């Protein structure tokens, strides 16, 4: 009802509704009625999205974590007049209204309607709708209801704040509208407008890992082919969805498409509490059978579980690790079930994470095979991976339900998808197993970048394939294995190539490491690393390893002590590099993947500096701000070439005792570029090659 009512208001509010404007854009014949969407996950956000599709209004979606400067640029470039946004984002725009000549209306997405139900502890409700027979204290799930109760108490404050903002907005020539006021009309029927398959229904501004965001235009055809084919995938057939927890940013195409899929399949949608402190509780209480996430979420989940196991008593820890290793050795098969039946370890862990979970589905980036396999065993769940882009309208490749290869990104979801690779650097499209930059053509592939004709033309090949910039190999069964991003492959001075994305994932497995950003070029013998650490977790590790006396750190001063200026003293650098070497020794990677030079930072990394709203790293920003360290390390290699030699660099300090030299036979395996691979034939099942096109003179296969 609210969707229909809001749709009606978009066409009739104040007599005209959302205005139509003419743009220098070929799509929609240059005519667009734009409604901005700028907020966090909420019911009203989703209602707005659906209402726009009915009314023929094009949504212009922006991440809520975009900086205010980026938002202002987008609003001015698109000459946007109507904007839906969260209440806590309004004041930032009002303060910059003098820079926003086109903006006229702000629609507050916050729900101000009071709920009738109240949590009553240890009492029975007379209407029988809810009974409490548990006389003990309420559990974690009850806390979420307390949060709702607190939110209700804040309603008056919100209303007062809105009234205050309305007065301020009025003086600036803006009008503020409460969402509920636009959904009061009772509308029985609405005629769906602009059903043309080529009509641009949404423009999504991508976060990007460098450069300014671009508006990805998605047509009705794109959205249909991004949503309907995945509904028929065999993962969902084998593990039917009944509940979905919406916690990934809905402004990101990944979560948004999943929402549409859930809507189409009649799946219950729970929206998380929007409080990061309660995310684990939200996941546990969601009862979702399939937990979708990105590498950052699953890396943290894995690190948390392993930390708790390592903190068990010596006997319990030994039993747990032996059971886990036994199950890993048997590939989590029938023998694994016997071991789990005896130890019940996975059930105990799973009960704390989400007892209903059957599947973990990773997207938005490659998860390291070790973490993927580890979570699969620890939680006794199936792990699958997909691949997609904003430009592809979300997931375009997805693993088959019987594909157990943790390196695989799966096969094409839609029958309209065609793909191939073209030779890039050392990756040859003409190899027996073709490798190179992934090129895609599909009905789900976007219709261009809004108002950026040149960027659109540059994004496609002459024969209409989108250039993803991702390096993959095409396996015998048509599935893809992700190798690296084209910008992430670096050639060192020896001519050896390293995969910085893989290195970043490798060392990010250390529980106290938030992010690892590797850098290298052809003037360097090995990569360096910018390491973001968590103060609290690092302190816990120092404490457990009896390092407090040596470092002079204690529970009272660690927050002040573990800052960038002191973290790069040799004692901390040695310690962290030791942990990195422990991780490295568990791999078969060659010595060029060892990081000798590291800079440790405990400063916050968020969307205002180094992270995109989907928690991908903006490498360009990191390299720029830490260029002082990069320059110091590069200078070391220059001096080495000129005949003088220095130790590894850490904020200008000479190398520490544990500098990792060019490799002992015991610790470092010899290697060449052939050692860096992401899969083997043994992992790949036979299949068709129908989607792999024949080569051309450009070595495109």
UniProtKB/Swiss-Prot annotation:
Q: Which residues are glycosylated?
A: 40-41, 76, 111, 127, 139, 181, 189, 311, 334, 344, 477, 557
Any one GO cellular component localisation term in the record: endoplasmic reticulum
Could you state a single Gene Ontology molecular function term? long-chain fatty acid-CoA ligase activity
Question: What is this protein called in UniProt?
Answer: Octapeptide-repeat antigen
Q: Where is this region: Disordered?
A: 120-140, 641-701
Superkingdom of this protein's organism = Eukaryota
Biased-composition ranges, Low complexity, are: 642-655
Known Gene3D superfamilies for this protein?
3.40.50.980, N-terminal domain of ligase-like
The entry's keywords: Glycoprotein, Repeat
Q: In which family does this protein belong, per the annotation?
A: Belongs to the ATP-dependent AMP-binding enzyme family.
Give the matching PROSITE patterns. AMP_BINDING (PS00455)
């Amino acid at each position: 009802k609210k969707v229909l009512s809001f749709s009606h208001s978009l066409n009739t509010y104040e007599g005209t509704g959302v205005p139509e404007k003419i743009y220098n854009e070929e799509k929609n014949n240059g005519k667009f009625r734009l409604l901005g969407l700028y907020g966090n996950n909420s019911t009203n956000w989703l209602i707005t999205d659906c209402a726009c599709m009915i009314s023929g209004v094009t949504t212009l979606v922006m991440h809520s974590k975009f900086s205010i400067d980026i938002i202002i640029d987008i609003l001015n470039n698109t000459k946007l007049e109507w904007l839906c946004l969260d209440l806590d984002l309004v004041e930032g725009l009002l303060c910059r209204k003098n820079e926003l000549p086109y903006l006229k209306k702000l629609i507050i997405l916050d729900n101000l309607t009071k709920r009738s139900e109240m949590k009553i502890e240890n009492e029975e409700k007379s209407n029988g709708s809810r009974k409490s027979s548990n006389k003990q204290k309420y559990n974690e799930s009850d806390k979420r209801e307390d949060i709702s109760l607190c939110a209700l108490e804040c309603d008056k404050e919100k209303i007062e704040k809105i009234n205050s903002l309305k007065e301020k907005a009025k003086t600036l020539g803006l009008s503020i509208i409460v969402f509920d006021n636009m959904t009061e009309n009772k509308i029985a029927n609405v005629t769906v407008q602009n059903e043309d398959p080529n009509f641009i229904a949404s423009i999504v501004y991508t976060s990007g890992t460098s450069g300014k965001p671009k508006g990805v235009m998605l047509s009705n055809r794109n959205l249909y082919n991004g949503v309907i084919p995945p509904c028929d995938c065999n993962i969902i057939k084998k593990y039917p969805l009944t509940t979905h927890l919406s916690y990934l940013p809905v402004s990101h195409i990944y979560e948004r498409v999943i929402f549409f899929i859930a809507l189409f399949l009649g799946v219950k949608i729970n929206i998380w509490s929007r409080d990061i402190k309660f995310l684990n509780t939200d996941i546990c209480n969601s009862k979702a059978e399939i937990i979708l996430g990105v590498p950052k979420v699953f890396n943290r989940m894995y690190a948390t579980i392993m930390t708790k196991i390592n903190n068990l008593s010596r006997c319990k820890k030994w039993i747990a690790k032996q059971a886990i290793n036994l199950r890993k050795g048997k590939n989590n098969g029938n023998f694994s079930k016997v071991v789990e039946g005896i130890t019940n370890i996975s059930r105990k862990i799973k009960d704390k994470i989400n007892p209903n979970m059957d599947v973990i589905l990773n997207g938005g980036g490659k998860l390291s095979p070790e973490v993927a396999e580890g979570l699969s065993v620890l939680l006794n769940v199936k792990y699958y991976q997909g691949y997609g882009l904003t430009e592809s309208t979300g997931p375009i490749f997805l693993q088959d339900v019987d594909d157990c290869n943790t390196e695989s990104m799966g096969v094409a979801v839609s029958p309209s998808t065609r793909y191939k690779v073209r030779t890039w650097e050392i990756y040859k499209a003409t190899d027996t197993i073709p490798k190179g930059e992934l090129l895609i053509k599909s009905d789900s592939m976007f219709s261009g970048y809004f108002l950026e004709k040149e960027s659109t033309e540059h994004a496609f090949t002459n024969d209409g394939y989108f250039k993803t910039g991702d390096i993959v190999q095409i396996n015998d069964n048509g599935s893809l294995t992700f190798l690296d991003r084209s910008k992430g492959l670096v050639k060192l001075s020896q001519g050896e190539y390293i995969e910085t994305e893989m290195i970043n994932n490798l060392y990010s497995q250390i529980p106290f490491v938030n992010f690892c950003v590797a850098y290298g070029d052809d003037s360097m013998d090995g990569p360096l690393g910018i390491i973001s650490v968590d103060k609290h977790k690092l302190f816990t590790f120092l404490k457990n390893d009896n390092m407090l006396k040596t470092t002079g750190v204690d529970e009272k001063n660690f927050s002040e002590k573990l800052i960038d200026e002191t973290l790069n003293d040799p004692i901390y650098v040695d310690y962290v590099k030791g942990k990195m070497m422990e991780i490295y020794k568990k791999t078969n990677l060659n010595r060029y993947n060892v990081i000798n030079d590291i800079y440790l930072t405990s400063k916050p990394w968020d969307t205002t500096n180094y992270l995109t709203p989907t928690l991908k790293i903006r490498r360009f920003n990191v390299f720029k701000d830490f260029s002082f360290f990069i320059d110091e390390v590069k200078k070391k290699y220059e001096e080495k070439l000129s005949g003088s030699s220095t130790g590894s660099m850490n904020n200008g300090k000479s190398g520490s005792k544990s500098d990792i030299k060019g490799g002992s036979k015991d610790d470092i395996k010899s290697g060449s570029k052939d050692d860096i691979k992401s899969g083997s034939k043994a992992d790949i099942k036979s299949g068709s090659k129908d989607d792999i096109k024949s080569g051309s003179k450009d070595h495109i296969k």
